[in-house]
Amino acid sequence: MSRISQIELDDRNLPPPTPEIEQERKVAIFDLIEENSFVLPKRDERDVPEGPYHLSLSIREKRLVFDVQTEGGDKAAEFHLSLSPFRQVVKDYYQICESYFTAVKTLPPSQIETIDMARRGIHNEGSRVLQERLEGKAEVDTDTARRLFTLICVLHFGG
């Protein structure tokens, strides 16, 4: 199965992330590189270069850009996704993450667990939206979609 072997976020124009967001980002990238599934389907009867792939994620002109290259540096694909379908779920995810980070410092474990369950539910929704938006462009499994959604959140809210 094809996979992502390297990932880069184009965050040059973003403010520095908070320590919590930077940690989430590092974990998502590490986990993504360790295990993922990323397949470029055949399009218009044209063959697609085989992976592993290098993926660059960026936001350009209010669109999420997936720039996919082979390990040899050849262009494998590039696709642009509207950010509109992600706006509400990203906003909800950040709000629940703020609550979670605050709860970890002050609340008992039972309340932290409740907030964490809500956080996971919103994260799952974001990964589902991503899988839908990637349909016909790239095939990703649920864990890969979850990790990519985390990175989209970092880009979407600018750290």
Swiss-Prot record:
Residues of the signal peptide: none
Keywords: Plasmid
Top-level taxon of origin: Bacteria
Region feature (Disordered): 1-21
Keyword GTP-binding: no
Family: Belongs to the UPF0262 family.
Name listed for the protein in its UniProt record: UPF0262 protein TM1040_3562
